[in-house]
Amino acid sequence: MSDETLAVALDTIDSLVPEMEWKTRAMARGLMRGYDARWSDQAERMIVCEEEFVVPIWNLANKGIKPSQSRTLKFAGKRDKRVLRNSSRWILDHKTTSVDIQDPDATYWRQLAINAQASWYLLAGHYEDLGAEGIIWDVIRKPAIKPKKIAQTMQKSVVAGNPYCGFDVSDNAQAYIVENGTENAELFELRVTRETINDPDRYYQRKPIMRLLHDMVDDCQELWQLAQDVLYSRRCNWQPCNSNACLTYGSPCQYLGICSGHDTIDSDNWRRREQVHSELDSIEGDGKNIITTSRLACFQNCRRKHHYRYDLGLERHGREPSAALQFGTTFHAALDVWWKAYKL
C-alpha cells in the first residue's frame, strides 16, 4: 500500500463527513490508518468491487421432475468484494461494529456464523457459477474513546515539539493545545491511530466462513419459503404489526405515528420512492418484486413495517440515517478506494 493510496482513502472520508462533524471524521480517519497498518501486507487480491446480482428464487422441494422457480420474485444484492485468497475465490464483506471481535467465541461471531446474508450471497454465487469457497467477514471495531483533555505535562511536551502518541504534530495543533488544552481533530485522529495500531487484533479481524452443499440446500429452501410468505402477506393484504419492534434501542420506528393513528400515509410527512431498493443501481422498475437480505430482515422484524417500506415505498421526508449507518457508509467508501490498490 502506497502513502498516496491511503491519502486518497482519507480524502474520501473528508469528502463525505462535514468538517463540523470533526469527531466522526477523526475517528474514521484514525481507524482507516489502523486498517492500512493491519492489512497492508495482505495476501488477498480483489477480483471485483461492489458487484450487484439478480438471481431466481428456486424451490428444490418441488414434487415435479425439475426444481421450480418463483414467477414473481427474484433475489438481489450487492457483494462488497470478490477476492482471490491463496488461489481460492471468496466473497468478502465489510462490517463495522462496536462490540468485541477479538474473542473467536464472541457473540458477534456466533451471530455471523448463521447470518442469512452470507448464506444467500453464497447461494447466489453458486447459481452464477462463481466458484466461491465461502465468505470472508472483514470486521472493523470502532474504538470506544472520545476527545479528551490533555495533561499539563503532555501539553508542554507537544508544544515543545515532541510527538503526540508517537506522531509529529502540526503548528496549528500546538497552538490549539496552548489555547484549549484539549484534543482537536488532528490530535484525536492520532490517538485513534495509535490505539488501533497498538492493538490490531482488538479492532481488525477477518474470518472465513464456508457452507457445505447440504447447508446451501437448506438455505435455498429457507429463501423460497420466506419469499412465499412475502407473497402470501401481499395477496391476503395481511400485515400484522409487531409491537415489540416499535422501539429499537430507544429509537422509534419511523412508521410508529401511522400505526398509532397519529399520522396517515397520505400526509405531507411522507413520499413514495420510485425504487424501493436505493442501494441497488441496476434494478429496473420499482423493485417491489425484488427480495433482498435487508428486505427479508424487515419482513421478519415487522410485517407492517415491511408493507409500508417495500409494498408502498413510503419514506419520511427529511429523514436522516442513523449515526452508525452514516459512519459505516463513509468507512465503506474509504475501503473501496483502499482496495483498488489490491486489484488483480
Features from the language model and the residues they span:
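RecB-family 4Fe-4S metal-dependent nuclease core
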Residues: 1-344
